């Protein structure tokens, strides 16, 4: 029976895999494929900055349901970046820098075509300046243009609450003088601590507000690929078990060494692909560089 279920999951349409999930499940208690620095298909300094070879729509079609979004503010717009590197819609780097509206066009199109699905949208200012302004722009110039497309409460939603919507996770501070309702500004990840040191231990993140929830985050991105897998990723996977009340975020990506994300992923992704995941275990949201159909399917099928 188990083999039949696995086979059915493999052949089902990855674009609508959440249609098979009971809507009474919390979204963040599912095992979800995600993409790290998802907008970097076309990006400056590609050897060190390119983390994806597909656009947003193609990633979602492949089964990805969590997007790691990095932005900078330009006037009254939000532009896509990976650190100092600008992201574009095409190979032509003399074209206009990718705008948040371009990203959302992919998301809205996908959700319109697949209303059973939801997208976890982790939003971060990657420019280290105007942190609060980035949230102002995101809320007023983008989210409020299509509020029916967004889930912005500061709690983990049930799938039925979030189908056809984008779940907003705010990884930046906001201007507290603006009178925003903390309960309606997205799941609050503003206490996130960058894991910049070469220490393998994951970190705890507690959200703010009356519905405080705890996340365990593994994002030790300073390691070279081999120790990254052996000292950080694999031990974290080994520690997984059934749901115990803490939400999990696990990054397979790494910026360590000089080989760049693509070459690093050629070491880490096959390691993860050959790692045995248990059907009844909770692995959380797994962010990847250069995911394949095999990788997304591996994560998705643990939900069935």
Which role does the model predict for each range below?
Residues 11-66, 73-113, 166, 170, ...:
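Long, acidic (Asp/Glu-rich), low-complexity accessory segments flanking structured domains
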Residues 144-280:
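Surface-exposed substrate-engagement region within the catalytic domains
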Residues 142-162, 287-304:
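C-terminal domain-boundary segment and adjacent tail
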Residues 78-83, 96, 127-147, 156-159:
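Active-site periphery "cap/insert" segments of enzyme catalytic domains
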Residues 71, 111, 127-130:
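A cross-family signal for N-terminal binding/gating loops and helix N-caps
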Residues 115-129:
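Active-site groove signature of glycoside hydrolases
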């Amino acid at each position: 029976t188990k083999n039949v279920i696995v086979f059915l999951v493999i052949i089902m349409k990855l674009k609508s895999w959440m249609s098979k999930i009971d809507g009474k499940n919390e979204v963040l208690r599912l095992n979800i494929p995600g993409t790290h620095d998802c907008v970097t298909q076309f990006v400056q300094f590609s050897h060190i900055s390119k983390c994806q070879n597909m656009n947003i729509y193609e990633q979602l079609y492949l089964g990805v349901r969590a997007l790691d979004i990095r932005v900078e503010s330009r006037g009254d717009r939000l532009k896509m970046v990976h650190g100092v590197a600008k992201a574009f819609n095409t190979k032509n780097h003399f074209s206009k820098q990718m705008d948040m509206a371009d990203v959302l066009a992919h998301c809205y199109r996908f959700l319109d075509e697949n209303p059973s699905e939801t997208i976890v949208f982790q939003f971060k200012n990657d420019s280290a300046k105007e942190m609060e302004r980035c949230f102002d722009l995101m809320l007023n110039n983008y989210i409020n243009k299509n509020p029916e497309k967004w889930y912005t409460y500061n709690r983990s939603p049930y799938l039925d609450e979030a189908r056809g919507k984008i779940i907003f996770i705010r990884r930046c501070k906001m201007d507290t003088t603006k009178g925003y309702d903390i309960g309606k500004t997205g799941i609050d990840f503003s206490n996130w601590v960058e894991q910049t040191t070469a220490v393998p231990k994951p970190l705890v993140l507690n959200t703010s507000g009356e519905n405080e929830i705890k996340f365990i985050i593994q994002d030790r991105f300073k390691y070279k690929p081999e120790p990254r897998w052996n000292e950080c990723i694999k031990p974290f996977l080994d520690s997984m078990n059934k749901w115990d009340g803490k939400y999990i975020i696990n990054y397979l990506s790494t910026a360590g060494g000089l080989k760049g994300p693509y070459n690093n992923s050629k070491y880490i992704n096959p390691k993860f692909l050959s790692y045995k995941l248990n059907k009844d275990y909770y692995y959380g949201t797994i962010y990847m560089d250069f995911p394949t159909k095999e990788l997304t399917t591996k994560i998705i099928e643990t939900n069935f």
